[in-house]
């Protein structure tokens, strides 16, 4: 089966999975942690691709527990791509937008945030009276909660891509033909 036959975006993953009959076996990828989370909220037992986001894999359960002891009133916000042991500590599991909206509407003043650190700027901008503490990685010598791949995107690159329509991505005609149906179906299901 072509990879294009089953791709979904994170925020739509549960909605897409729920659209299939419960007795239909599904293969979920590329993120096993997101797949585990979807399994837990849907009661499914999907087969999971053994891939994961390097940022969400590196949060330390022990260090988050230590932070929680320092800030006992803090709520722990966790992205569903985090390991299951981290997710079990969560007061709220949600997408980037879901975590931001939760923080805006919460009466809590302190939050421990277990996701890519780029969200912290927006959280602090929208909630200047609240304290957002990045969840620590297992390795204290690195900036492991920053995604190097996301940092490759810049406004200048986006501008040039829109203006000059480059870089051009070439897709094999047969792959494009096979991919168009699930992409359209995914968009229909996510409305």
Summary of predicted features, one role per range:
Residues 10, 48-52, 134-138:
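Short beta->alpha connector loops at strand-helix junctions that form conserved
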Residues 19-25, 43, 61-67, 111, ...:
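Short, surface-exposed amphipathic charged segments that create phosphate/polyanion-binding patches used
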């Amino acid at each position: 089966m072509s990879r294009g036959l089953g791709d979904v975006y994170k925020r739509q993953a549960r909605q897409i999975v729920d659209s299939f009959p419960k007795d239909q076996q599904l293969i979920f990828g590329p993120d096993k942690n997101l797949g585990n989370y979807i399994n837990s909220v849907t009661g499914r037992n999907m087969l999971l691709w053994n891939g994961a986001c390097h940022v969400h894999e590196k949060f330390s359960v022990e260090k988050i527990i230590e932070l929680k002891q320092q800030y006992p009133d803090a709520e722990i916000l966790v992205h569903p791509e985090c390991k299951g042991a981290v997710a079990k500590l969560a007061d709220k599991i949600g997408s980037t937008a879901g975590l931001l909206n939760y923080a805006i509407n919460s009466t809590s003043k302190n939050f421990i945030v277990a996701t890519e650190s780029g969200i912290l700027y927006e959280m602090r901008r929208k909630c200047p009276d609240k304290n957002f503490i990045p969840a620590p990685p297992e390795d204290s010598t690195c900036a492991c909660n920053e995604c190097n791949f996301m940092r490759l995107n810049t406004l200048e690159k986006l501008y040039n891509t829109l203006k000059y329509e480059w870089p051009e991505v070439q897709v094999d005609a047969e792959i494009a033909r096979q991919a168009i149906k699930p992409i359209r179906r995914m968009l229909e299901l996510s409305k």
